[in-house]
Amino acid sequence: ITTNIKKLVDSNKESIAIASTSTQTEVNENIIQILRQRFNVRNIILDSAVPVDISVVLLNGVSDSLSVDERQNLENYVTNGGNLIIGQNRLAVDIQTQQATPIISDIFELLSNYGFQIEENLVLDKTCGKVNVQQNMGIFRMAVPMDYPFLPIIQTFNEDEVVVSGLEGLRTMFPSEITLDSLHNTMILFQSSDHSSTMSEFYNLNPDPKVNPVFSQLNENGKILAARSEVLNNETGIVGQVILISDSKFFADNGGGGSPENHIFVLNAIDFLLGDSELISLRSREITNRPLEELEDDAKVQWKWANILLPSLFIVGFGFIRLRGEKNRAAMLEELYD
């Protein structure tokens, strides 16, 4: 609905760029197809200056330092009032080998200039996606789906921020915690739940809870996983904006780029950065993921016993009523024939 409305009122499409460095190879076809319904989408390399007609730049997380030209072009774009949405975490994770390696890059210094500090850790959340784990079932070996806290499902949003207003769920992969610098004009967008934790230094990525004890220790408050910053150019008075999601694969096809909920967030973010926020609340109603409310362990036990006892009590009570009715009927027949 929102796409069709926008097509009717837009005479000129804005230009959106999917930026990459000389070392990046991420595929972003899913998000590109979504964006092309409303925008002119171009792929650009940061070793050249960002074209002046680009309204918003999307950038996947980098795993190496930027070249001098790449960093300068990115900085110049934001300084001159450009809008940047970047997915960047602090560790490169290989789920196949279950290894996490710290990323060494000057991108973190650049982001710190905008008020973002990405901690060298991984955030875990009890509200999470699942992975298949091979387990022995008798003589068979089967893939069993298990919760994997390294894939937080986001349900805690800053309702004061239009970008995430009305959203109910997002999917992230191996995010890192974001710390905000109070000296900059930064705002939280979303965070993990209050059943979270972090892992640092030694990374046990095994999905089997039997060999990963941290999965039973998710009792910390929510961690910031996305925020935005307003970047003021003191000389010109122009304000650029940066939105950071601490997930390097948030736009990529092999990561969050395959999630419809994430598509809605990206479209909301672009509309907000373009000063075109009136359709955000309408679009948020298109959310396809409406998860059931999580119950505490005590509540689960109570409902379990209620499900066991109440049917039995109902049957016993119904039996007493029937027995009483039969006795009354027998008494009436005795009186009738006496």
Positions of the model-derived regions?
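Short, surface-exposed patches at the edges or C-terminal ends of soluble domains, predominantly
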Residues: 1-338
